[in-house]
């Protein structure tokens, strides 16, 4: 199975410094709702003491955790250091916590 960019997709955005069981649980919840997941990794390496991992390491760790069980069900995007999410009215998707 291959990730389908035209299929309904859930989006999760974070630093994942480091990726852990709670992130995986959120991924699994989003997957059960949306069918596939886009994981947006904010590139925050070195901005604070809480961001020690280079983005390449973060992405590698996420793949190591998910690939065996969820190949084709997710994609990972490198993002800039997003500090806010803004949207217009009637954009065609929900914003949930």
What are the roles of these predicted feature ranges?
Residues 1-97:
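Nucleotidyltransferase catalytic core that binds NTPs
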């Amino acid at each position: 199975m291959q990730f389908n960019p035209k299929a309904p997709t859930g989006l999760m955005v974070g630093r994942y410094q480091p990726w852990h069981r709670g992130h995986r649980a959120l991924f699994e919840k989003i997957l059960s709702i949306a069918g596939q997941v886009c994981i947006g990794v904010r590139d925050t390496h070195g901005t604070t003491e809480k961001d020690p991992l280079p983005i390449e390491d973060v992405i590698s760790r996420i793949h190591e955790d998910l690939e065996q069980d969820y190949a084709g069900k997710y994609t990972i995007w490198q993002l800039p250091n997003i500090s806010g999410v803004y949207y217009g009215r009637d954009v065609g998707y929900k914003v949930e916590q």
